[in-house]
């Protein structure tokens, strides 16, 4: 067993290399949860831990975000499974994750053409997902039965030191099949997620039921990890131990923005929760006062058509642009001058964290939960005065780095946007404070906190 020393909260902690197993519903989506898991898994693997990701329904689809070749990926929906050290793993390609699965009995997809190959193939073929398909005749484990039975068998074969659920369907069964191993529930949403998602008097009982089922499930875990201080006392009523660990910055280090481009961006799914219609409405005011500035929104979702119609109706074509999903979001941050967010609620807004690492001023609705733990509001007067950037870097913890706006207050939102657009000095000062505050979210800081938690459970 290998031992290392890391610094957590200014203390030197000795860690042993661990076998860590994550469970998640899917990896093919471009959401924040998938992005964060890929970053954490890659970092933990680079620090000597053996990391496995059990995916409930990958179905041969390619993970949206890159996964390190040393990370095991197990597709629980596949009929065959081969694990590290298993004879059928020997033929896996060097650039594929160590765990190999088949997406269909005896059929693999060629990475170049996507064409099918039959089970008569001499060796498995690495798919576009970086997952090698195991022929039906290979010496591999056949996965049968319910999800519970499949997960139990996978835990037995992987033999992890600690099991982590991202609170998908597996959250109710993982402790029962973990064989006494420490289990951690990691929740990426606010406690009241279901009440907000299923609003209205008729759906209230269903929201209560979903919330109650989750509370009951996490009560069986050794630790619950939440993203915000706001939710700590709530979860402590339902789980024996609760910790708050921020999400890390998930974008690769890049060029800090010069804040010179007359361009602001928003990032997120085009869905009701993100509430981009308010942002577009606010921009109709901004476009009159600051006509040479533009807004670009990155994301996709069911409301794309409605947003395009709103943009056209308000005469904002060319001023507000829907850019879809991009994998290199880092370059977009580097070439923008502010990050805008109008969510109705959040778990922990990853876009704000990412943008702060590129030195962008942040403007957000003060929704529950998360923004107020990332943004220090500059107030009506700008709040920063003529404080030099060097001083801001030393006092990042409580130095204004943007604006918090009451939810639904479109006019105030537009006013705050115009302030940053029209005042170069204010924009630079807020950006410097934003960059300085981002040290709390560096991957190294966050991964050390996770290592400390895992070690304390062993």
PLM features: what roles do these ranges have?
Residues 23-30, 43-106, 111-138, 234:
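N-terminal strand-loop element at the rim of the active site
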Residues 152-153, 204-223:
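Membrane-proximal helix-turn-helix segments that form the acceptor-binding/catalytic region
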Residues 165-170, 187:
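Short His-centered aromatic/hydrophobic patch
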Residues 230, 248:
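Carbohydrate-associated surface elements
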Residues 256-274, 280-283:
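Conserved donor-binding/catalytic core segment of Leloir-type glycosyltransferases
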Residues 325, 344:
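Aromatic "clamp/platform" in nucleotide-sugar-dependent glycosyltransferases that forms part
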Residues 376-410, 419-424:
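Conserved acidic donor-binding segment of nucleotide-sugar-dependent glycosyltransferases
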């Amino acid at each position: 067993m290998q031992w290392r020393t890391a610094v957590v909260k200014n203390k030197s902690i000795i860690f042993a290399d661990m076998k860590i197993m994550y469970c998640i519903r899917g990896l093919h989506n471009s959401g924040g949860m998938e992005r964060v898991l890929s970053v954490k898994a890659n970092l933990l693997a680079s620090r000597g831990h053996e990391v496995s990701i059990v995916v409930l329904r990958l179905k041969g689809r390619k993970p949206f975000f890159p996964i390190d070749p040393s990370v095991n990926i197990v597709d629980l929906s596949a009929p065959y499974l081969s694990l590290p050290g298993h004879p059928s793993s020997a033929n896996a390609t060097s650039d594929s994750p160590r765990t190999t699965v088949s997406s269909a009995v005896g059929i693999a997809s060629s990475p170049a053409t996507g064409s099918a190959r039959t089970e008569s193939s001499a060796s498995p073929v690495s798919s576009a997902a970086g997952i090698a398909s195991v022929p039906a005749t290979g010496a591999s484990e056949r996965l049968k039965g319910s999800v519970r039975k499949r997960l139990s068998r996978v835990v037995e074969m992987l033999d992890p030191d600690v099991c982590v659920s991202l609170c998908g369907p597996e959250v109710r069964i993982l402790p029962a099949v973990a064989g006494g191993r420490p289990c951690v529930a990691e929740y990426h949403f606010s406690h009241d997620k279901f009440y907000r998602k299923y609003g209205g008097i008729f759906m209230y009982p269903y929201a209560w039921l979903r919330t109650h089922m989750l509370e009951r499930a996490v009560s069986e875990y050794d630790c619950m990890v939440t993203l915000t201080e706001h939710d700590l006392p709530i979860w402590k009523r339902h789980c024996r131990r609760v910790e708050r660990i921020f999400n890390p910055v998930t974008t690769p280090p890049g060029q800090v923005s010069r804040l010179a481009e007359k361009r602001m961006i928003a990032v997120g799914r085009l869905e009701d929760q993100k509430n981009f219609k308010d942002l577009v409405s606010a921009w109709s005011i901004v476009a009159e006062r600051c006509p040479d500035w533009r807004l670009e929104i990155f994301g996709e979702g069911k409301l794309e058509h409605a947003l395009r119609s709103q943009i056209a109706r308000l005469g904002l074509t060319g001023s507000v642009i829907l850019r879809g999903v991009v994998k290199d979001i880092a370059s977009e941050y580097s070439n923008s001058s502010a990050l805008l967010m109008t969510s109705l609620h959040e778990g922990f807004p990853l876009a704000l964290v990412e943008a702060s690492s590129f030195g962008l001023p942040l403007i957000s609705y003060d929704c529950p939960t998360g923004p107020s733990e990332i943004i220090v509001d500059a107030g009506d007067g700008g709040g920063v005065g003529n404080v030099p950037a060097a001083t801001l870097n030393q006092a990042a913890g409580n130095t204004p780095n943007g604006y918090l706006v009451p939810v639904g207050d479109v006019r105030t939102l537009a006013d705050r946007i115009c302030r940053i657009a029209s005042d170069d000095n204010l924009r630079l000062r807020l950006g410097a404070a934003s960059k300085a505050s981002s040290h709390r979210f560096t991957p190294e800081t966050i991964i050390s906190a996770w290592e400390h938690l895992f070690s304390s459970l062993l």
